[in-house]
Amino acid sequence: MIREERLLKVLRAPHISEKATMSAEKSNTIVFKVAKDATKKEIKAAVEKLFEVEVKSVNTLIIKGKTKRQGLRQGRRSDVKKAYVTLNEGQDLDFVGGAE
């Protein structure tokens, strides 16, 4: 069993983009930014516990940080790990829905 403190640190934020929105509408998939060391099992447990939904599958990927320049200084943005969480049929999770 994964500790509750760890589950709270696994999910960083929902990733909201045009692709993520189309994915949510088309295949019931939600996209999250997650901790770099998070496993698929931890991500699944965190989503199921925090949002009380059933998760069908979890796919992860790491986006490499871009190299950026400002004048003569050169730096690099941090790498980011994203998780595509597919929910079971009939499950719904809405982050961008309008407030009433």
UniProtKB/Swiss-Prot annotation:
InterPro entries on file: Nucleotide-bd_a/b_plait_sf, Ribosomal_uL23-like, Ribosomal_uL23/eL15/eS24_sf, Ribosomal_uL23_CS
SUPFAM superfamilies recorded: Ribosomal proteins S24e, L23 and L15e (SSF54189)
Protein name as annotated: Large ribosomal subunit protein uL23
Any one GO biological process: translation
Biological function: One of the early assembly proteins it binds 23S rRNA. One of the proteins that surrounds the polypeptide exit tunnel on the outside of the ribosome. Forms the main docking site for trigger factor binding to the ribosome.
Organism: Vibrio cholerae serotype O1 (strain ATCC 39541 / Classical Ogawa 395 / O395)
Entry GO CC: ribonucleoprotein complex; ribosome
HAMAP family: Ribosomal_uL23_B (MF_01369_B)
Entry keywords, A to Z: Ribonucleoprotein, Ribosomal protein, RNA-binding, rRNA-binding
